[in-house]
């Protein structure tokens, strides 16, 4: 199962992303069987978009299936995919600052605004919120309420593909 994505670097970056794979029901059943074998403190990472052949509530379905097992879920997805899983109390969610702004309905310009928006996600169920901010580094609001901020090394960006 593959897809072809084309990234064009010519003054500005352009992405042409192909359609995701067609996932048969048997493959989803196999995945669910494998997930059933996860135990307490295992980590499950759900990242990216959901292929068009699957229901858009697939992440919710998978986390509901694991509820009560102590599996630590990490979710890196956009808008509704992320918001809809908060009820399952994921261990970590990782929006970027623009995605976080879309979720809370405002442009986030300062660290204080980003922290407040991250805490909104925590109030909705996220345990830890890691916000990536491109060249400005990242900010983590942990489940104890502590804020951790880290910059990133300065340098010349050659290609940002895969850097999110």
Feature annotation, model-predicted:
Residues 1, 20-22, 79, 97-100, ...:
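Short, acidic/turn-prone active-site loops that include or flank metal/cofactor-
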Residues 64-65, 111-163:
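Conserved phosphate-binding/catalytic region of the ribokinase-like
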Residues 1-42:
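Conserved N-terminal subdomain of the carbohydrate kinase-like
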């Amino acid at each position: 199962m593959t897809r072809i994505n084309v990234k064009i670097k010519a003054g500005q970056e352009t992405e042409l992303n192909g359609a995701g794979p067609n996932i048969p029901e048997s493959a989803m059943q196999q995945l669910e069987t494998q997930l059933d074998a996860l135990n307490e403190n295992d980590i499950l990472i759900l990242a990216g978009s959901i292929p068009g052949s699957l229901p858009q509530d697939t992440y919710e379905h998978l986390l509901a299936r694991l509820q009560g097992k102590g599996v630590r879920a990490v979710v890196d997805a956009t808008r509704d995919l992320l918001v809809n899983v908060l009820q399952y109390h994921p261990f970590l969610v990782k929006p970027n600052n623009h995605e976080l702004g879309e979720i809370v309905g405002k442009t986030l310009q300062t660290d204080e605004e980003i922290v407040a928006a991250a805490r909104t996600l925590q109030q909705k169920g996220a345990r830890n919120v890691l916000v990536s901010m491109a060249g400005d580094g990242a900010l983590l609001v942990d489940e104890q309420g502590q804020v951790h901020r880290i910059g990133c090394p300065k340098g010349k960006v050659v290609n940002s593909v895969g850097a999110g």
